[in-house]
A protein has these predicted regions:
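Structural and coupling elements of P-loop NTPases
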Residues: 1-178
Length: 178
């Protein structure tokens, strides 16, 4: 959110072209071009950032209230669709509890069916804590992951005593290349 003319809706909509079922967990709050906070789509609570990066609760701004409502409905439907039991409950009751949504979101994320979308500005130290909390809550620990075969054809299991294995990559767009 720290780039000039950053457009949340365009980025969110663009995820569908990647074949990903994106679920918006946050909607940015802006004052002009400045990223000043976010609305939690699941709870409907809004938060603003202080000068020191501290977060405080505030009212949902009128200019994003309709977007939050639409995204809330879409997010609930996508989470429900990712789990047969949740879908039945959603169809019977017409809604899901926050706890059901959080459990369904984690299951769908771990299964690779859902892609949570959050907002932050690392350059301005805004929203990073919420992103890290989402990573902790939604992604599986290494101990929950199955064994895999590495590039050398060896099976590797999660082991805290084994050497660190990682894959580092960077994407680059060169404006001068064809």
């Amino acid at each position: 959110m720290d780039r000039d003319r950053a457009d949340f809706q365009m980025a969110f909509d663009g995820l569908s072209t990647l074949g990903v079922k994106a679920v918006a967990l946050q909607v940015p709050i802006r004052e002009g071009e400045a990223f000043t906070g976010y609305v939690d789509v699941l709870t409907g609570k809004a938060y603003t950032f202080g000068a020191d990066g501290a977060v405080s609760e505030c009212d949902v701004p009128a200019d994003v209230a309709d977007d939050v409502s639409l995204l809330h409905d879409l997010t609930v439907e996508n989470i429900a669709e990712s789990d047969e039991e949740l879908m039945e409950k959603y169809l019977e009751e017409g809604s899901l509890s926050l706890e059901d949504l959080q459990i369904g979101l984690r299951k769908g994320t771990v299964a690779g069916e859902l892609c949570p979308v959050l907002v932050c500005s690392s350059l301005e130290n805004k929203g990073g804590v919420a992103v890290l909390e989402a990573i902790q809550a939604l992604l599986p620990a290494a101990s929950e992951r199955p064994a895999f075969v590495d590039a050398l054809g060896q099976e590797r299991k999660p082991d805290p005593d084994a050497p660190v294995a990682g894959f580092v990559f960077k994407t680059l767009a060169d404006p001068f290349s064809g």
